[in-house]
Amino acid sequence: MKKMLLATALALLITGCAQQTFTVQNKQTAVAPKETITHHFFVSGIGQKKTVDAAKICGGAENVVKTETQQTFVNGLLGFITLGIYTPLEARVYCSK
């Protein structure tokens, strides 16, 4: 039982969250994202592509300040539980004020 608990704790410790931020303009941005979209990938997203039209969300490309993609702890946990079959990823779009 101790070995199983130790293996589970070790697996949770070595998994991590990932976040990529792309700053488009150096303008004042809203604190909260204009829109948060969850993309549903399968088999770690191999051969899959999802896009977000940030210009459409912000009402024009000149209003886009930054975009982020993030694999949260919960997303990583879902991927771990399903052995990588289901691997969600969140995308956020920030617009100028």
Curated annotation (Swiss-Prot):
Keywords assigned by UniProt, alphabetized: Cell membrane, Lipoprotein, Membrane, Palmitate, Signal
Taxonomic superkingdom: Bacteria
Transmembrane spans: none
Topology in the lipid bilayer: Lipid-anchor
Gene Ontology cellular-component annotations: plasma membrane
Main subcellular location: membrane
Residues bearing a lipid moiety (S-diacylglycerol cysteine): 17
Signal peptide (UniProt feature, chain positions): 1-16
InterPro entries per the UniProt record, alphabetical: Lambda_Bor
Entry's localization field: Cell membrane
Key word Lipoprotein present: yes
Magnesium is among the record's keywords: no
Pfam families hit by this protein: Lambda_Bor
Lipid attachment, kind N-palmitoyl cysteine: 17
Recorded family membership: Belongs to the lambda phage bor family.
Additional note from the record: Encoded by the cryptic lambdoid prophage DLP12.
Protein name: Prophage lipoprotein Bor homolog
Species of origin: Escherichia coli (strain K12)
Recorded name of the encoding gene: borD
